[in-house]
C-alpha cells in the first residue's frame, strides 16, 4: 500500500493536481496489476489553511510500488501544492 497525500491552500488547484496525478499514475499501476483508488478529499479535508486530497495505490504483496522516478513526480506538482508519499501508512 502507498498513500499519496496532496495539500495546498487553493482548493481547486489542489483538487486538479490530485486528479491529474491520479490519471498519470493509472497506467503505471495497471501495468503492474496495482489498483489506484481516488483521488478523494482526506477524511479531514482541511487543516489550517490547507486543503488535503489523497490517492491510494494497492498491489500484490512483495512487489515494487509502481511509481515513476520522483524527479518526474515533482515536475507534475506546482510549488504551492505539497506531495507526501507514505509507503505502508499506519493510518488511512
Language model: regions and residue ranges:
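Accessory helical-bundle/CTD segments and flexible terminal tails appended to RecA-like ATPase motors
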Residues: 1-92
Amino acid at each position: 500500500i502507498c498513500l499519496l497525500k496532496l495539500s495546498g491552500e487553493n482548493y481547486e488547484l489542489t483538487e486538479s493536481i490530485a486528479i491529474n496525478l491520479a490519471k498519470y499514475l493509472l497506467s503505471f499501476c495497471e501495468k503492474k496489476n496495482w489498483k489506484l483508488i481516488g483521488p478523494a478529499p482526506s477524511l479531514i479535508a482541511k487543516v489550517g489553511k490547507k486543503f488535503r486530497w489523497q490517492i491510494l495505490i494497492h498491489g500484490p504483496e512483495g512487489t515494487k510500488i509502481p511509481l515513476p522516478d520522483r524527479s518526474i513526480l515533482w515536475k507534475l506538482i506546482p510549488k504551492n501544492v505539497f506531495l507526501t508519499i507514505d509507503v505502508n501508512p499506519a493510518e488511512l
